[in-house]
Regions:
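C-terminus-biased signal that marks the final domain/tail of proteins
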Residues: 2-328
């Protein structure tokens, strides 16, 4: 975790306070962690470089800025540089809680923390999952709307007649002098692209995968892009349309159109989309295993060409499949 030092005028129109302060902790083997725009590292070991590294001025700079005045041993990165408040818990840490709750046991004891009611009941930095977390499980964690929790976005009044798990901004609003809040779930409508990076120790270094998708994670799909790919698939190209310029060959615009259609009758449409998503992603995971076996027999140069062609072709197949869904 890191934060910039802010601006201090050097008298010449420049910044005399450059750089960042940071802490990095190694996640223990067999555990998982998560992060959602709120610092989570509190106290940390100062003499264990195998498992924790930090900038040399991480504590002294906090003292200089008046953020901390206690002993070094008790220094908490989050409490100094990003103190918890209601928004940090409800809009950020709640998303971490939703992930932890999906993969690990006994996370409901932190419900009051996730809802922003009890910052003293802070979640651990990492948790031990009940089973090995598969790529598909992680894909689906990105689609969460707090289903089955007190913050379930399909179940309150704002969901309307079709159980829509989205609340158009702002997140906070006031009625008759009373302030209310909309949830900020993991899956959200203002998504340009999303991905899951998969580092794999059982294949060569050029065979890592970026599972890549566009628009809302809950109503879109991931496709494998190998890290040795030498060309961007046409449907994902930066010059193929833009946020302000529609393109019929752009995956973003295609997925965005399907998602917006689903928002109107979510309970009737989202389930059909999810069937296509699950079928595609499960088949892609299986197909990657077959591709791995063939790629491992090739020279590095030939392998790069082979995996690049596979990534491009698969992305186009996804685009074609979504075009059919768009007309369904």
């Amino acid at each position: 975790e890191l934060i910039g030092k802010g601006f201090k005028d050097d008298g010449k129109g420049g910044n005399a306070r450059k750089g960042i302060v940071w802490v990095a902790r190694r996640i223990p083997d067999g555990y998982v962690s998560a992060h959602a725009n709120q610092a989570r590292i509190t106290t940390f070991p100062k003499d264990d470089p195998e498992n924790c590294l930090y900038s040399p001025d991480v504590i002294s700079f906090a003292r200089e800025m008046g953020y901390y005045d206690g002993p070094d041993a008790d220094f908490s990165f989050s409490d100094a540089y990003a103190p918890l408040d209601f928004g940090g818990m409800r809009a950020c840490e709640a998303r971490v809680w939703a992930f932890f709750r999906t993969v690990a046991d006994d996370m409901d004891r932190y419900t009051d923390y996730a809802m922003g009611h009890n910052k003293n009941n802070r979640m651990p930095l990492w948790v031990k999952p009940r089973a090995k977390v598969s790529p598909k499980t992680l894909f689906d964690c990105m689609r969460d709307h707090y289903e089955g929790t007190p913050m379930d976005m399909t179940a309150d009044l704002g969901a309307g007649g079709h159980n829509c798990p989205y609340r158009w901004r702002p997140m906070e609003f006031e009625v008759d002098g009373v302030k209310y809040v909309n949830e900020r779930a993991t899956a959200t409508q203002q998504t340009g692209f999303w991905f899951v990076a998969q580092a794999r120790p059982d294949v060569t270094r050029d065979m890592g995968i970026l599972w890549f998708g566009v628009d809302d994670a809950a109503t879109s799909c991931l496709t494998p892009i190998f890290c040795s790919a030498q060309e961007v698939p046409g449907c994902f190209r930066e010059d193929n349309g833009s946020m302000l310029e529609y393109s019929p060959t752009s995956a973003f615009w295609l997925f965005n159109r399907v998602s917006n259609f689903a928002y109107m009758r979510y309970d009737m449409i989202a389930g059909d989309i999810r069937k296509v998503v699950d079928k595609w992603e499960n088949e892609a995971l299986r197909l990657v295993r077959d591709v791995d076996a063939e790629a491992m027999t090739l020279s590095p140069k030939a392998r790069g060409k082979f995996l690049s062609e596979f990534s491009i072709a698969t992305a186009q197949q996804l685009f074609d499949r979504w075009s059919k869904l768009d007309k369904y």
